[in-house]
């Protein structure tokens, strides 16, 4: 899951 700062999924928080 790709979550940019938790927007999609909170497992990867890419800031």
Swiss-Prot record:
Upper taxonomic lineage: Eukaryota, Viridiplantae, Streptophyta, Embryophyta, Tracheophyta
Gene Ontology CC terms: extracellular region
Keywords, comma-separated and alphabetical: Carbohydrate metabolism, Cell wall, Chitin degradation, Glycosidase, Hydrolase, Plant defense, Polysaccharide degradation, Secreted
Function statement: Defense against chitin-containing fungal pathogens.
Organism whose genome encodes this protein: Capsicum annuum var. annuum
Any Gene Ontology biological process: chitin catabolic process
Name the record gives this protein: Endochitinase 1
Main location: secreted
Enzyme Commission designation: 3.2.1.14
Family named by the database record: Belongs to the glycosyl hydrolase 19 family. Chitinase class I subfamily.
Keyword match Secreted: yes
Tagged with keyword Secreted: yes
GO molecular function annotations of the record: endochitinase activity
Catalytic activity entry: Random endo-hydrolysis of N-acetyl-beta-D-glucosaminide (1->4)-beta-linkages in chitin and chitodextrins
Intracellular or extracellular location(s): Secreted, Cell wall
Domain of life assignment: Eukaryota
Transmembrane segments annotated in the record for this chain: none
């Amino acid at each position: 899951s790709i979550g940019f700062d938790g927007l999609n999924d909170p497992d990867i928080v890419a800031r």
